[in-house]
Amino acid sequence: MGKITFYEDRAFQGRSYECTTDCPNLQPYFSRCNSIRVESGCWMIYERPNCQGHQYFLRRGEYPNYQQWMGLSDSIRSCHLIPPHSGTYRMKIYERDELRGQMSELTDDCLSVQDRFHLTEIHSLNVLEGSWILYEMPNYRGRQYLLRPGEYRRFLDWGAPNAKVGSLRRVMDLY
């Protein structure tokens, strides 16, 4: 079970709303979100309803302003509680679409895809175990995408506008 609290103002001030499960539309509960406190669980928050738009990964901790979660604005309109995973993590990445071309396998976090695999683009991937966060830049920066187990035959399947991938991180409550 997870628990996340959204606050309209910075530093956990103003009107607040608490969630313990997925919420496809947060608009009725607050008009803007400038701080968040995650008491338990791992969450994806989204700038638009129905888990659309820019997405941001949050784990247990305090985020006193939206820059702390690498947000671009104070617009948060939906959230998703990522189910906990208590096993191994495994993903295959491919340099071409349709799971073709050079393949590399990951079982742990990757701070820089370019340094580790000599790739700046990943065109398809197969998440075999666990959920992962894909970041468009190295060092877990830039746009973020939640990857659940399954095949992603092209970058559009995970919602990206291009195949640029900088880093990958396992979804875990604590690092």
From Swiss-Prot:
InterPro entries assigned: Beta/Gamma-Crystallin, Beta/gamma_crystallin, G_crystallin-like
Gene3D superfamilies hit by this protein: Crystallins
Designated gene of the protein: CRYGB
Keyword Repeat: yes
Family that this chain belongs to: Belongs to the beta/gamma-crystallin family.
Annotated disulfide bonds: none
Protein name, UniProt field: Gamma-crystallin B
Domain Beta/gamma crystallin 'Greek key' per the UniProt entry, residue ranges: 2-40, 41-83, 89-129, 130-172
Subunit architecture: Monomer.
PROSITE patterns xrefs: CRYSTALLIN_BETA_GAMMA
SUPFAM superfamilies, per database record: gamma-Crystallin-like
